[in-house]
Amino acid sequence: MSAEDYHRAIAIERRTGQRLLKGRALSAGEIAAILSVCCQDSSVKGCRDAALIAVLYGAGVRRREVVALELDDWNSVDYCLTVRRGKGDKDRTTYLDDGAAAALLAWLAVRGEHKGTIFHPLRKGGRIEMRSISDQAVLDILLERGKEAQVASFSPHDFRRTFISNLLDAGADISTVQKLAGHASPVTTARYDRRGEAAKRKAVSLLHTPYSRESTDSKQ
């Protein structure tokens, strides 16, 4: 993807002036705070919520994709998940880092080895219901945990924006990030970039202008 195409993708204009991009990326501190309140909750719910949030962020999956994940989609050897029939009815493989994988494994140890979706709703007392968690339940969990962690308002899709922004910031090429995110075009991936001015400063810091006042004076 050329620099021209990239900047065209993120330059969204309106009739008068420039429109702010929707959504935001969460900071590392915010994600840590949300996961921390889950880990401090020693109940089954705390374990499940930590795993759910870790997968949303660590795998960059959409909300409807995370509720559809099944146990057979998890590869505990390679720490990867197969996202089936994502947007565009396409399958893809996405990988978890050690932290996200540890959170998921902790939940699976509680959940058990029965077939079906990975994430289930819970009854009072932490009893697992043998059905898929709903999209709305995921939203409710995030709102609850975000409020407990005193984190500014965010949406489930902001975890996906954060996933993409952080990978780009870490130096991953946009083509690879596109595949992990399940986008049809790198232009779409670029629109998820929420790194802002800090990314521009970081990029320019990689350059070196060979200017020296001393070398200039010596030539006079």
List the predicted regions and their residue ranges.
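Conserved catalytic core of the tyrosine transesterase superfamily
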Residues: 1-220
